[in-house]
């Protein structure tokens, strides 16, 4: 990185950047697309913030949560010499939004934070294009991947958004990008020869523990007993909104300053909890997965899961809220075997076929239609039409480009076939989600080193047990060392290698063990195969 920019970063933000951060910044300043996969708390936001100091134009930051947008704006405001930042979202008053746009037009703003559903609007794109965009930064970029654990269809339009903004460099940032997700991010954002940084996933300072329970009442009591005795800021993750209040009330009765948090609360209520936690007025936040992306609190000491997350990806991201100050932290998962059935139920859901057909029929057989006109033409609500359109785009039945939404020449040409294509895609994704839940069960039930298993899921192997998890402490990790991702067969089946299976199609090798291999298949999700079967029956072919 240029010495002048390095000095400027120190003067403005007080930061000394690491080489990996600088390498991504250099790529962006050379007008090259970049994908950075870095652990939670490793300074991903610093990349676009410092890059903004060296660019001539706006940095547009796509962020999925209002809380995350506001946190970043407040953080930048704490640095008096930093370029001005504004967040444009539905919680803002009309006057505040108008003032922010005036400042953008006048060249007084360096960073604009938006949600993806706002960024696709024609008037928003026109204003940004007129102001001049130097960089599009996509935060939580795994949300664009249908193979990611937090797929958000609104992200699908971002590749086209970049084109409509004049195709500035695109920077994608995420903490949970396994090889298949990284490939999907690059493809869906239309990235061109991107610089890809995938630093290690290990957070060795977080102690990993799992506790199995036979009964729900026993599990609930164990969670309350544990959290009531913990010392330090704590996040408790639960599966339902009702559980946030139940646990928060129980913990408050035990003397902890606990508050519930979920997406169904009013914005002001969520912000009050969020601010109270950051300021130290709230000790424990009991939350659904809605709480997390916007947390920039370095001294969280514990993350406790009262219910199993829907995937290892979600688990990894949520425990990553702990110990960002590099001090020791802990993560405990409480579960019953039945909890995995609950998560399987949560994994399903797709738009109605009638809505899909209506949207497909609203798109002309030749030519295109603007997104803004599609809602009225389909005769649906904006939300329903948007879900159906995203499903059709994801299935490859429609495409969205600078001219608008159009049919794919070699895709389905009638509504019934288009609806079947989206149903097939939904079934495919459900199989993938079920495989993620199965992998989460394996993590919970393994007697091997949990960190070895966790890292192996992401293709980041650990040769020896970590020494900082419950199975290492109990001694079972050493006894079970033949069944962990240790890279024993990497020579024949290296991580990230592409393979072909007769039934499941193309896949990517995630990790190998002494006697097995784990592969992610696009049509079937995660599958663990015995190496003896692979070799004797030629189940896999390198491609």
Where are these regions (language model features)?
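Actinobacteria-biased recognition of intrinsically disordered, low-complexity terminal regions
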Residues: 1-3, 481-488, 540-543
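C-terminal accessory region of SF2 helicases/translocases
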Residues: 282, 308-317, 323-500, 508-510, ...
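Basic/aromatic-rich interaction segments and small domains that mediate binding to polyanionic partners
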Residues: 502-543
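Gly/serine-rich nucleotide phosphate-binding loop at the start of the catalytic core
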Residues: 60
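Helicase motor core with emphasis on the C-terminal RecA-like subdomain
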Residues: 3-11, 16-45, 51-57, 67-361, ...
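Long, compositionally biased intrinsically disordered regions
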Residues: 246, 301, 491, 514-516
């Amino acid at each position: 990185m240029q010495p002048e920019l390095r000095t400027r970063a120190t003067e403005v933000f007080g930061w000394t950047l690491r080489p990996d951060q600088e390498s991504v910044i250099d790529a962006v300043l050379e007008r090259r697309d970049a994908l950075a996969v870095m652990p939670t708390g490793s300074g991903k936001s610093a990349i676009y913030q410092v890059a903004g100091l060296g660019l001539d134009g706006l940095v547009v930051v796509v962020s999925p949560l209002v809380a995350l947008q506001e946190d970043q704006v407040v953080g930048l405001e704490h640095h008096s010499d930093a370029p001005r930042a504004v967040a444009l979202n539905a919680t803002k008053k009309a006057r505040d939004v108008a003032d922010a746009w005036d400042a953008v037009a006048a060249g007084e703003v360096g960073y604009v934070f938006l949600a993806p559903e706002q960024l696709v609007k024609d008037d928003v794109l026109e204003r940004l294009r007129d102001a001049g965009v130097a960089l599009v930064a996509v935060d939580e970029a795994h949300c664009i991947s249908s193979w990611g654990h937090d797929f958000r269809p609104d992200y699908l339009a971002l590749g086209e958004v970049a084109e409509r903004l004049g195709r500035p460099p695109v920077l994608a940032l995420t903490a949970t990008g396994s090889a298949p997700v990284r490939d999907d991010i690059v493809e869906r954002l239309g990235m061109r020869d991107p610089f890809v940084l995938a630093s290690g996933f290990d957070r060795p300072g977080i102690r990993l523990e799992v506790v199995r329970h036979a009964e729900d009442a026993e599990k609930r009591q164990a969670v309350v007993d544990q959290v009531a005795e913990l010392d330090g800021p704590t996040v408790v993750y639960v599966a339902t909104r009702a559980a946030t209040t139940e646990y928060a009330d129980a913990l408050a009765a035990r003397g902890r300053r606990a508050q519930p948090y979920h997406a169904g609360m009013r914005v002001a209520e969520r912000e009050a909890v969020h601010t109270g936690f950051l300021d130290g007025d709230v000790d424990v936040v009991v939350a659904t997965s809605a709480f997390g992306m916007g947390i920039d609190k370095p001294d969280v000491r514990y993350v406790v899961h009262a219910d199993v997350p829907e995937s290892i990806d979600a688990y990894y991201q949520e425990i990553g809220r702990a110990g960002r100050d590099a001090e020791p932290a802990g993560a405990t998962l409480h579960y019953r075997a039945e909890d995995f059935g609950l998560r399987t139920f949560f994994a399903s859901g797709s738009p109605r076929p009638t809505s899909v057909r209506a949207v497909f029929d609203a798109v002309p057989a030749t030519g295109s239609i603007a997104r803004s006109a599609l809602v009225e033409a389909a005769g649906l609500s904006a939300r329903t039409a948007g879900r159906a359109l995203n499903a059709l785009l994801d299935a490859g039945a429609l495409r969205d480009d600078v001219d608008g939404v159009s049919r794919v020449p070699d895709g389905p040409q009638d509504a019934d076939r288009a609806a079947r294509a989206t149903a097939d895609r939904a079934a495919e994704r459900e199989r993938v989600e079920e495989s993620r839940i199965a992998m989460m069960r394996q993590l919970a039930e393994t007697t091997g080193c949990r960190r070895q298993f966790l890292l192996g899921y992401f293709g980041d192997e650990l040769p020896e047990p970590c020494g900082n998890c419950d199975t290492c402490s109990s001694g079972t990790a050493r006894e079970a060392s033949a069944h962990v991702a240790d890279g024993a067969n990497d020579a024949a089946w290296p991580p990230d290698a592409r393979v072909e299976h007769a039934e499941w199609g193309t896949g990517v090798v995630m990790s190998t063990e002494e006697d097995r291999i784990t592969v992610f298949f696009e049509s079937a999700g995660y599958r663990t195969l015995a190496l003896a079967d692979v070799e004797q029956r030629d189940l896999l072919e390198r491609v």
